[in-house]
Amino acid sequence: MRIGVAGLWHETNTFAMEQNDSMETVHIQGGDVLLPQGYVRNFMGGFVEGANHPEVELVPTLGISFSHGGLIHAKVYERCRSMIIDALREAGPLDGVYFAFHGAMVAEAPYLDAEGKLVQEARRILGHIPMVGTYDFHAIMSDYEVESLVPFPNNTNPHIDGYERGLEAAKCLLQMLDGTIQPVTHRVFVPVIGPNIGQSTWSHIPVEERGLLLHQLNLKREALEETPRVINITILGGYGYGDSPDAGMSVVATTDGDAKLAKQLANELARDLWTQRGELQKVRPIYPIDEGVRMAMKRKETPVLLVDLGDDPGSACPADSPVILESLIRNQASDCALTIRDAEVVKAGITAGVGATITMDVGGKIDQRFYQPLQVTGVVKSIDDGKYVICGPTHGGWGRKVVRDTFRETNVGPRIVLRIGNKIDVIFSQRRTGKDRDFFKSAGI
């Protein structure tokens, strides 16, 4: 059996300034490079392991991602879609296809449903062969997709179950190929754009976890999945920053040949979500920056994390906000570490060298709608090439439910550590700021 493998990854913030308006922002992987080598606990790693069968040949085609988190321009999308479709067509006879998606990609009209348009075209040229796909929890899923393939999205937020969903997708595809099952999927759109901080499904703190709406609904979802003939049920968070008709939440249920049951279970969870939607706003309070900094300074347990929801690099924000740094300096905080994306500061620090004192405007240079650059003086503490190893699965997380056995090399480009004020260490990087503790450790913090 020959199974084609293709990928399209992008979480599109349609409000972001940095858009993908040329092929220069496109990253393409092809051939064996597309398939992970060794034991990798992510979607693709799970699928490859699950499809490891003597009679299965995985046929890697193309995987495409993008540099910027903003809107994909129509011409760029058309070119990328054509490249993937051509690669599938040229792969020779295929018995099935696995798509690795993020699921929240938005391109200019008429391609708002970017993944759906790709799946439709793939179905048109490949005919009625079995297809499965893995998706992020924040996927903006459409009816086009569930009509054309069997989806296996994250059940967790923060996302720590990509590997397991990949295994499930592989198992489902192999069973479809041998005729064991005939999946049918039903999707219910729930017109709710939930705040991401209210959409957590688990927590390190048991009492907090019990109060999470999506944790409670996931317990019910897990119980419903034990129903005979049920293959998979998922509550999707959607992605409000991807301004499109399907941006809200949804519930997707897949059964073995029982369309009525799939519809019943999806509707039941969707009703529960809708009637309790107000709970999504009650999870965590949001504090003004100075108040949050002062609260952190009073905490005896460390480390304390300050989360700037307005400049989340994972949601395509510039990651160059200096507002927390400004507050730390103003409140005379000490023993702090943070990251700011600023290529000019990196260049100046490298030129000056370790031990040099520099004065510069930092941050606020990419999107100045909400904050301005901040002038600071600091000592260049270290310089490195930005290559390091992330220990842990997706985003380098350390959730209590994950296996700490994954190591991934990553490269954020040249960076410097600038010590400012009373032991405030700021990592400046040319690309993205880090989403894991190893970003800091590898810089000597």
PLM regions and their residue ranges:
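N-terminal amphipathic/basic leader segments beginning at the initiator methionine
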Residues: 1-53
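Active-site histidine-anchored catalytic micro-motif
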Residues: 4, 9-11, 25, 74-81, ...
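Short acidic, glycine/serine/threonine-rich loops at helix termini
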Residues: 15-19, 72, 109-111, 142-147, ...
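Low-complexity, highly charged intrinsically disordered N-terminal segments
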Residues: 48-76, 80-88
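Glycine-rich phosphate/diphosphate-binding loops that line cofactor/substrate pockets in enzymes
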Residues: 53-56, 60, 86-95, 292-304
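Conserved anion/nucleotide-ligand pocket segment
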Residues: 159, 163-219
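Hard-cation-handling environments
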Residues: 197-431
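A C-terminal functional module that forms or caps the active site or interfaces directly
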Residues: 424-445
